[in-house]
């Protein structure tokens, strides 16, 4: 099964990994942060601001791969501060209120100044 690298200017890029990969009917979105691609800086310093931007970035990568939020079957979330869990859920519920995908949340063990959240997704087009 051939794989297609997904790129978009509507989400931040890294020289170390692809924004996303499409393999057959699966679309994989790399860990995506709350960086605003137009400024190159974090979209804010609250968990709600960064979660909103990270989800916006993930959605842009999904679109570039031919998928949408309704196609997402799994989401992985890494938080730098466990106390942000409730704020994360507050913003997350605005995006996935009915028939949400599976999800896990874990603590991110890497300390990056300003980073509060990283989100990855898997979508299925079947």
Indicate residue ranges for each PLM-predicted region.
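N-terminal presequence-like segments and the immediate start of the first folded domain
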Residues: 1-56, 60-73, 79-126
